[in-house]
Every structure is written in C-alpha cells, then in structure tokens.
C-alpha cells in the first residue's frame, strides 16, 4: 500500500516505519488551490525516507522540457538508491498551469507522448539524436543515468481512454483517480486489449489506483468531510458521486471498497486521506488496513 505523503516530515517517517510501501507527491504550477510543485517535493521526500518507493502522483509532464525531467529524475533516483517512480499525466484541469509555463494546452497529449519516449532514451546515458514534433536534439547526452536500469518506472495517470492507450503503449503502469471499482475493471480490459493489439506483453505492468479516503466511526461525518474536501479541490459538487469515486465511511466501509478495487485488478494503492482527520486516517490505513491489501509496489530493476 502507498500513501500520498503529508507535509509533516515526522508523519512521513512514521508512515514509513509502519510499513508504507510507497509515498507520493503531486502538484501544480499555477492552480486555483495552493499546491506544491511535484519535483521539488519529490526531492524533499527522497531525503525524508530510506526504504519506501517515492514517486510523483502526478507530474504534469507536458509542462516541462523532457531533458530537464530526465536529468532531475536520474539524479533523484541515484540519491534514493533506486527507489523513484514517475507518475505522469497530461493535466488540463487548470489552463493556468499551461499559461504559466508558456505551453499550448492543446499540445499536452502529443508533448506527453514524445516526452515519454525521450525520457527512456535519455535514461540510457547515451547520446540521443531526436527530431520530433516538439523537440530536436543531436547527440544530446544526459548522464550519469538513473540507478535503476533503463530508468524508473513511468506510471500513467488519467481517466480517459486516450490515457489508457498511452499506458498500454508507453507506460509501466496505470493509475487512474476518481474511479469506481467497476470503472477500474473496464479500464484494465481496455488497456489489455490495446496491448494485445500492438503485441505488447504486460507481465511487468503495475496496476495502481489513486483513491481518496475519508474515514470516521460516523459514516455521515466521513461522507461530509469527503464531499467538502473534493468539492474544494475540483470546484464541483461531489454529493451525488462521492460513494462511487472515493473510499468513504467507517474503517469497515473503507476496507470493503478497497477490497472491491483489488477484485477489479488493483495491485498497488496510492491512498490520499482527505478531511480534518487525514493524518490519523493515514496512520490507521498503513498500520491496520494495509496488512490485507498491500500487493506490491511499482518498481522494477
């Protein structure tokens, strides 16, 4: 089981000591909500941990030059002794992210695909010559390479079929968010079908799910907290959909929902506790719920 890392370094260490398999950070450049920048906080997390996989969930890849991302991740992977995973997405929820970085929002898909291919090439440590739609390089070398052979795993995040196809073609894993178990199962089928169509073996592929969690002994309190938290983040009314897209309720309710995700094909959770008791929820999840649910972590090499 993995968790979104809290900002408090002592809680981060406590979660790792209690057996969190992975810890994740995400962020935006210029969203309406106050959020960190993913790569900066990933560097912080590398220094705060010793054993857990550390990753981004999510780095908005089209906002950044792929050579820079390749260099940053290679350096962090060596600093973390090969514990880094890279969760990437196209973004688009907030046009302000793209305005801030001078990137046309309509190019986010093509930039992401090209950048993913370039990351793999740069992580060999060999000179890269590339003439694509968005970037041109002649013999550009990013070195030394990451500690993990071939580079850290790239886990594709998203919700739509185009993201599923990206995962099937270019990713090492799939991590949707705001999904029900039923929708997750359908996404697994779609990715497998696309992989079969292109002749790709998914034996080493990691099936992840990013799940918001609001837990309380009072089910109504947990639900109210979740609706308020997600409504503030996504500027939407979650009152009708919260039970589908989050794990909400008593500890037993949350365990049942996560069990349903496991039945739908999830191998590794990235759980994001929300609400006023998020820190205590994180402790309870990693101490108690994880024992029956942790199915590995998204790394290779």
What do these predicted ranges mean?
Residues 45, 76, 119, 154, ...:
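Conserved, mostly hydrophobic/aromatic
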Residues 1-3, 23-25, 53-57, 84-88, ...:
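Hydrophobic faces of well-ordered beta-strands that scaffold small-molecule active sites
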